[in-house]
């Protein structure tokens, strides 16, 4: 956490660590067990084994936040409402600072989704799983390129919570033709947002994205999940 170790670094031997910290082998191994459970290290067994440093994983934070939300009775609608607060603000910020590379990456994501929609309309056998991943990636790009790390981390935690909660509901209830049409509308909305960003129209981009999020909320929480349902990570 102090930045003294990098991802992939190998920790010293057990003997060296015991001497360095003045602890017993059982205490050290218990510390290893806890850090491994928190995805802070990975342990390889054998002659060439040892403990390797892992980068902090957002999914670990999301798991604990999700549990806290569930225990406090937070609804999935409340989680989505928080995204509605964060994303338009991020879009406004992005419009004032966007670079050409940001526009290129957003356009590439939209184009990939457009091609998937066209292919899915022509071939009912094509899976739409990639569509959901691309949609999340577009939102993720907006947050990442807005340039506020605190906002990006908070959004990432909320995304992981929503993905976990909605995964089974979406797979059960989504009608394919409705899903294809929803992705088609997303392509149109995403393209419009990119145009606002290209023009550096921060107010227009923010208004458009808030409307997009409101419409998406009615679709997502109206057909695929109960907005009043408490966050559930164990379905």
Which stretches of residues belong to each language-model region?
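All-alpha effector-binding/dimerization core of bacterial HTH-type transcriptional repressors
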Residues: 58-147, 178-199, 203-204
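Short linear motifs at protein or domain termini
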Residues: 1-92, 96, 227-235
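Short hydrophobic alpha-helical segments that form membrane-spanning helices or hydrophobic packing faces
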Residues: 106, 154-156
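Short, charged helix-to-loop "capping" segments that act as catalytic/coupling loops
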Residues: 40-51, 120-128, 165, 169-183
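C-terminal all-alpha effector/ligand-binding and dimerization domain
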Residues: 156-235
């Amino acid at each position: 956490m102090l930045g003294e170790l990098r991802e992939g670094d190998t920790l010293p031997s057990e003997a060296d660590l015991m001497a360095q910290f003045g602890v017993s082998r059982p205490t050290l191994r218990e510390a290893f067990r806890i850090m491994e459970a928190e995805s802070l290290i990975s342990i390889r067994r054998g002659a060439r084994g040892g403990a390797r440093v892992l980068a902090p994983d957002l999914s670990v934070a999301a798991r604990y936040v999700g549990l806290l939300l569930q225990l406090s009775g937070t609804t999935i609608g409340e989680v989505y409402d928080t995204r509605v607060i964060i994303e338009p603000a991020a879009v406004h910020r992005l419009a004032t600072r966007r670079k050409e590379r940001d526009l290129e990456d957003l356009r590439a994501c939209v184009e990939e989704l457009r091609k998937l929609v066209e292919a899915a309309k022509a071939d009912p056998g094509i899976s739409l799983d990639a569509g959901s991943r691309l949609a999340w990636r577009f939102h993720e790009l907006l947050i990442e390129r807005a340039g506020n790390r605190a906002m990006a981390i908070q959004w990432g935690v909320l995304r992981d919570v929503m993905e976990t909660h909605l995964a089974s509901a979406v797979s059960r209830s989504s009608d394919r033709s409705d899903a294809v049409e929803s992705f088609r509308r997303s392509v149109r909305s995403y393209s419009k947002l990119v145009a606002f960003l290209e023009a550096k129209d921060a107010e227009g981009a923010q208004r458009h994205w808030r409307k997009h999020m409101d419409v998406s909320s009615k679709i997502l929480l109206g057909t695929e999940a109960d907005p009043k349902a408490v966050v559930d990570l164990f379905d």
